[in-house]
Amino acid sequence: MSKHHIQETLQAGNMGTYRPNALFTRISSEGDLEPEYGDPLPGAVALHAHEYTHYLHNLSTNAGAMSLVSSFWLIHPFIKNADRNARILVSSESAVDDDVISAFKVMNVMRGVTRGIPKGYSWPSARSWDFKQPTLAVHEVTHSSEIVAKVNVFTIKSRAVFSDDHSLDIEIQPGLDFISEGVAYEIEREIRRLAGISDDFLDYQTPSYPYLTFRPLVDFLIGQPSTAEERILLGTFALLDHSPSEGLIKACSVIRMELQEGLEGGFSNYLNQALYHFKKYANGII
């Protein structure tokens, strides 16, 4: 989660954490909105808004719901193959059930994957980002050895360039984890900005990934600088899609086409269609 400016602001991460597997938010007493003594710390409201955004994304989007469902799918095989100390007893030679593989596939599609970040890596401030065009892979989901769905998944090769000119190459498959952090940080940042925090300190000590990666990625995908409102909207609607990475690519491509061709109304139509399909999906499972 994001760091906070020591004197002027309180940001999510040091003081708050959302646990998607348990559906609860933990915020330390320093982030209280009604502290026992004195006034709330600057940025306390932004902290709560950040974590509540994760809560909403996990409970009210397709990516969040399916991430949770895929975890439920793994409960039975875990119990079946674990001893009383929760140690898995299946040997490495044992065959893995197709349904278990599919559960992990769905989880990875929904939550996303980022490859190439060294273990324990401490992100310095990135001076710039370089992104390649997204590449497509089709993931097959099976049940009882039969293919029940095919999902388009997009990955973006990315390079972070730092102030000392060294760089780090990673691959981002956008999903719930990356997109929700990007959207939550945009909301948090806007609240702090509107509260009077200086622009010079809004991103101070904030890790470049994932918080400061979402904005340049969206800018790249739409072909021009984006607004905070656009990034929040694009990210949220991407999470309503059956594939968050595809949802983000599709939404950004609609804006890009509008800009290139000078058309109007295409993005509004896309959002209406996306919302219609999500409501239809949600009504079908409730």
Language model segments and positions:
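Long, well-structured alpha-helical subdomains associated
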Residues: 95-183, 188-286
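Intrinsically disordered, low-complexity segments enriched in charged and polar residues
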Residues: 1, 11, 43, 50-53, ...
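Catalytic zinc-binding patch centered on the HExxH motif and its immediate surroundings
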Residues: 1-39, 69-84
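Post-HEXXH active-site segment of zinc metalloproteases
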Residues: 38, 42, 58-99
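Active-site recognition of the HExxH zinc-binding catalytic motif
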Residues: 46-60, 181-185
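Short pre-active-site segment immediately N-terminal to the catalytic Zn-binding motif
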Residues: 27-49, 170-175
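Conserved catalytic core of nucleotide polymerization and phosphodiester-bond processing enzymes
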Residues: 23-26, 56-57, 62
